Amino acid sequence: MKFAVAVIFTLALAMGVQSSVIPLLSQVAGHGLSYTAVSGPAVVASPWAVPAAHWPAAVNVASWPPAAIHAAAPAVLAAPAPAVVAAHAPSVVVAPVAHSGVYTAQTRGAIHTAPLAGHIQSVASINAAPAPGTL
């Protein structure tokens, strides 16, 4: 009996969470409330923000209606530019960096140390506890 009551309460809670009033109020123009609709500008959340999404990319959508799409572009003559020659910079030799991070493991007969690659500053990880079942 307790199990049946717990199942009923769990299902009631799940139905209450899924049937909240917030999704009902957040349905704007047929789509749900998105992150950009909450925090972004209104243009981003608007479903009509990109009216040219169904046209090819070659269509000029800067002006709507397309009045000046076929306007002739002015001719531009390029003047010769001076040649740029790159100067050779002195080569810089980078010395290898010794990593000082060390892992130390102590067993019954020996102490093992191993460098920890990738540590820039001094890091020590010491495992001095005996392995399980060795005492």
UniProtKB/Swiss-Prot annotation:
Signal sequence region: 1-19
Tissues expressed in: Detected in the epidermis underlying the head and thorax (including legs and wings), but not in the abdominal epidermis of newly eclosed flies.
Per-repeat ranges for Sequence: 72-75, 78-81, 128-131
Keyword Signal: yes
InterPro entries documented for this protein: Cuticle_Acp1
GO BP, sorted A to Z: adult chitin-based cuticle development
Gene Ontology MF term list: structural constituent of adult chitin-based cuticle
Role played: Component of the cuticle of the adult fruit fly. Could be involved in thickening of the hard adult cuticle.
Domain notes: The tetrapeptide (A-A-P-[AV]) repeats found throughout the protein are also present in many proteins constituting the protective envelope of other species.
Name of the featured protein: Adult cuticle protein 1
